[in-house]
Amino acid sequence: MNVSAVIVAAGRSTRMNKSLNKVYLSIAGKPVLYYSIKAFDEIEWIKEIIVVTSPEETEYCQENVLEKFYWNKPFKIVKGGEERQYSVYNGISVVDKDCEIVAIHDGARPLVTKEIIMEAIKAAYLYKAAAVGVPVKDTIKVADEDNFILDTPDRRYLWAIQTPQVFEKELIVKAHRKALEEGFLGTDDSVLVERMGFKVKLVEGDYKNIKITTPEDLVVAELFLRK
């Protein structure tokens, strides 16, 4: 297998009330981004890791994450765009020419495991597109603009989508280019593939695979890491 991992670390931390990007905040003595990369770095199938950063944080990432710790894989560091979707496109645009599969992961999800990543990669080889997620536990309501309930979808068919999301390289590149040409902005990568008429296979993940968004998430993540 020849897999490239794209780790997206170019987001803004507006809900953290901190000047430092959340992926560089510390959990158990190491940056959030360290843990997000580490699980991919330990997988034999993955041949390279591409880290997408904010333009103003490229040097900081290089010095405080990529050069500070020992890694097995070669790295590329790429500057991100104004939106996550553009950052992902910048990352997938520089994958190795021999790459068959691209695994895209949020740098703010430090609790992802090797096992989940590998299951998603295997699913992508079989189905061309796979996304990690978990069945929702709560009842979900669809509301109108005035916060009145319009509908209650059947919970049996609802999943909360996480990352990684893994795709055949040619498919995800085409999907991103199509979205760019048409001015479509999605909330994740799988929706871009869905727009092309492809089915995306769901791979059950872990409820612990949270995205660090608030200060409380840092506390929760550290508790899980120390277990």
Swiss-Prot record:
GO terms for molecular function: 2-C-methyl-D-erythritol 4-phosphate cytidylyltransferase activity. Keywords: Isoprene biosynthesis, Nucleotidyltransferase, Transferase. GO terms for biological process: isopentenyl diphosphate biosynthetic process, methylerythritol 4-phosphate pathway. InterPro entries: IspD, IspD/TarI, IspD/TarI_cytidylyltransf_bact, Nucleotide-diphossugar_trans. Signal peptide: none annotated. It holds the Pfam family IspD. The record marks 155, 211 as: Positions MEP for the nucleophilic attack. The record marks 15, 22 as: Transition state stabilizer. Disulfide bonds: none annotated. The keyword Ion transport does not apply. The keyword Nucleotidyltransferase applies. It is an enzyme of class 2 (transferase). Belongs to the IspD/TarI cytidylyltransferase family. IspD subfamily. PANTHER family: 2-C-METHYL-D-ERYTHRITOL 4-PHOSPHATE CYTIDYLYLTRANSFERASE, CHLOROPLASTIC (PTHR32125:SF4). Catalyzes the formation of 4-diphosphocytidyl-2-C-methyl-D-erythritol from CTP and 2-C-methyl-D-erythritol 4-phosphate (MEP). This is 2-C-methyl-D-erythritol 4-phosphate cytidylyltransferase. It comes from Caldanaerobacter subterraneus subsp. tengcongensis (strain DSM 15242 / JCM 11007 / NBRC 100824 / MB4) (Thermoanaerobacter tengcongensis).
